[in-house]
Amino acid sequence: YMQVLGKELGKLAEVHIITHASENPLPISNCEIHNVSVYNPINGRFKNEVSKLFDVIKPDLVHVNCCWMPACAFIQQMAQKRNVKVVLTPHGMLEPWIIKRHYWTRKLPALLLYQKAAIQNADCLQATAESEKENLLKLGYNSNIKIVKLGIDAESIAMKTSWKKSKQLLFLSRVHVKKGINYLIEAADILRDELQGYKIVVAGEGDADYVASLKQQIMDKGLQDIIQLIGGVYGDKKWELFQTSDFFVLPTHSENFGLAIAESLASGTPVITTVGTPWNDLNSSNAGAWIEI
């Protein structure tokens, strides 16, 4: 997402990205990337770094790409104190399933402390699908919502060259409870006889404790020969997985878009996903299956 956004916006304007250092940094063309310290409300290092960047960059517009992080809310506050317009893109983080998860212990305190104000004060909210816009309107905090769909650089993605069955199914996304990987494991357990000779590859990074719980679930069901958790994959290895798999499977509870779905289709690999995504066209276009969990 940021690679495509930075590349294209950078052709039209001067683009700066404020972020934290990553173990797997992505090259983004036509923009300047600024790594800042991790937000800490006790010391002022993060605030000072961001303030200095604002003084140097003097932005005309700030585009915030997250929710539920005090650092993002702080950057929005700093921008609006300087009379800089702010666009907030929740990326599905304000979908009902997400808000309900840990509502009393995490979401409600965050809403009261900073997140509700951030949504209300944003000059514009960007939704990436009609379903996301409808849910943002139901939330009732800000009605100035525009739909700007996400996209991928399809021309740079190589189509698979063989449609011969590889007997490989692929999950490639963040390893998080929202993604419904447990349903994939349960389905494999039910269909273990039909899946003899198949591999289900689960690619992605996630919280160590959650990854460990999935591995334990796989062991408890005796599915070690079928399901493999391989960690995060990037670059050529990622595209190789898309191109060599028979299906891409994303059994998610909720997605505002699902970039990996678009990437799989661009690679020529059909997709099985849920009604928690806005990809109902999969059924009508015979490109996969859009199903209830």
Question: Where on the chain are the PLM-derived regions?
Answer:
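Short hydrophobic beta-strand element within catalytic cores of glycosyltransferases
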Residues: 270-273
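Carbohydrate-associated surface elements
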Residues: 21, 131, 151
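Nucleotide-activated donor-binding/catalytic signature segment of Leloir-type glycosyltransferases, i.e.
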Residues: 212-233
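Membrane-proximal helix-turn-helix segments that form the acceptor-binding/catalytic region
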Residues: 94, 107-125
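N-terminal subdomain of nucleotide-sugar transferases
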Residues: 1-24, 29
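Aromatic "clamp/platform" in nucleotide-sugar-dependent glycosyltransferases that forms part
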Residues: 253
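A conserved mid-protein helix/loop that constitutes part of the nucleotide-sugar donor-binding site
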Residues: 167, 171-190, 200, 209-213
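Acidic anion/phosphate-binding donor-loop and adjacent secondary structure
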Residues: 137, 143, 147-166
